[in-house]
């Protein structure tokens, strides 16, 4: 019998936590015991995985020495407090928050891009999961980066409200219903009404005028590609879509590559579906294609008419699946295959 593992899911009742448990089930991850963890308020509720019912336990009193793998998806403050405790008990932590991403001794991993970095988990027994917008962009750019190099990335993101949690989904649906029925809307999660709107502001503003979400894409891209000279210029926008982030990506390559050659590279790459027909509907969208699917979709591949070595791409993925939960499970799969077996 193949080895099975005891796994803790911190934030098990949140949007990402619920999807994590679903993906562990779908991919038949070798679970011995599953420990869904949440706040005391959620303790006692049940989740189902692999044909069994598992009771949600109180994170505050949980003994992490009982598990080999702990997945954290409950916010940076929770990870800051509990992840080092879990790691000190021999549990390998895979953290879905931003808390550890910039730590030099913590590997920041996208399995299709830099799986070799997982080996460095032994530094602190912690592996960081990148930001959702970074993950899909780098999955799409890795084959091109390896083939011809990239000097600069310009990207505008169009990000779904589920990236802000369940409360944001509720706010969007309530605002939409109210507006369609001629009622006033309440604004709590976002700085302005999100229904029928676009908000060019995700996370806090920095001194340089960029938001922290935008700077995450800069820092994380350079760390994952191990290339401090790679220039990244992002604009992050929240739009009234429930699931699926979209990105308009423009790159300047070191060597010229045609759209056709780029398309061939992407078609052969793991985790990518190229949907690039130059006709009505011949492109991927967040709701129709990406939602509830694991792939990163790449469309609108074309050479930049304003730059000799420029290339444009439209990149779409489910932000809760590939942007968080799936990427985490893929890391765990490599971890048990190559390091914990």
Predicted regions and their residues:
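Helix-loop-beta segment of a Rossmann-like dinucleotide-binding subdomain
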Residues: 121-128, 197-208, 313-315
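N-terminal Rossmann-like NAD(P) cofactor-binding subdomain of oxidoreductases
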Residues: 1-194, 230-231, 264, 281, ...
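A short glycine-/small-residue-rich loop at the edge of a beta-strand within enzyme catalytic domains
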Residues: 11, 185, 189, 205-212, ...
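Oxyanion-binding "anion nests"
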Residues: 195-242
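Generic solvent-exposed, charged/amphipathic alpha-helical segments
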Residues: 21, 218-222, 263, 267
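C-terminal active-site/capping subdomain that shapes the small-molecule cofactor and substrate pocket
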Residues: 230-341
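Glycine-rich beta-alpha junction loops
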Residues: 40-42, 132-133, 157-164, 198-205, ...
């Amino acid at each position: 019998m193949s080895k099975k593992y005891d796994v803790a899911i911190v934030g098990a009742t949140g949007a990402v936590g619920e999807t994590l448990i679903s993906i562990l089930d779908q991919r038949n991850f070798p679970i011995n015991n599953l420990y869904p963890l949440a706040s005391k308020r959620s303790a006692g509720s049940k989740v189902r995985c692999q044909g069994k019912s598992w009771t949600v336990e109180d994170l505050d009193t949980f003994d992490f020495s009982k598990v080999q793998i702990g997945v954290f998806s409950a916010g940076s403050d929770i990870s800051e407090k509990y992840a080092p405790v879990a790691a000190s008990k021999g549990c390998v932590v895979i953290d879905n928050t931003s808390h550890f991403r910039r730590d030099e001794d913590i590997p920041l991993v996208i399995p299709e891009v830099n799986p070799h970095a997982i080996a460095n988990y032994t530094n602190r027994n912690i592996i960081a999961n990148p930001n959702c917008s970074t993950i899909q962009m780098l999955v799409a750019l890795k084959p091109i980066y390896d083939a011809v190099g990239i000097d600069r990335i310009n990207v505008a993101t169009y990000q779904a409200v589920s990236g802000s949690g369940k409360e944001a989904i509720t706010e969007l649906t309530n605002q939409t219903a109210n507006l369609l029925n001629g009622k006033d809307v309440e604004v709590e999660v976002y700085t302005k009404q999100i229904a029928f709107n676009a908000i060019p502001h995700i996370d806090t503003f920095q001194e340089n005028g960029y938001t922290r979400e935008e700077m995450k894409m800069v820092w994380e891209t350079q760390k994952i590609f191990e290339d401090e000279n790679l220039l990244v210029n992002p604009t992050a926008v929240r739009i009234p879509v429930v699931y699926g982030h979209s990105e308009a990506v423009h790159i300047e390559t070191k060597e010229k590559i045609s759209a056709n050659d780029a398309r061939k590279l992407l078609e052969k790459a793991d985790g990518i579906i190229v949907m690039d027909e130059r006709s009505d509907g011949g492109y991927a969208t967040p709701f129709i294609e990406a939602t509830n699917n694991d792939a990163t979709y790449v469309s609108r591949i074309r050479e930049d008419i304003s730059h000799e070595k420029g290339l444009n791409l439209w990149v779409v993925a489910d932000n809760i699946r590939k942007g968080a939960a799936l990427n985490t499970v893929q890391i765990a799969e490599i971890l048990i295959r190559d390091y914990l077996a």
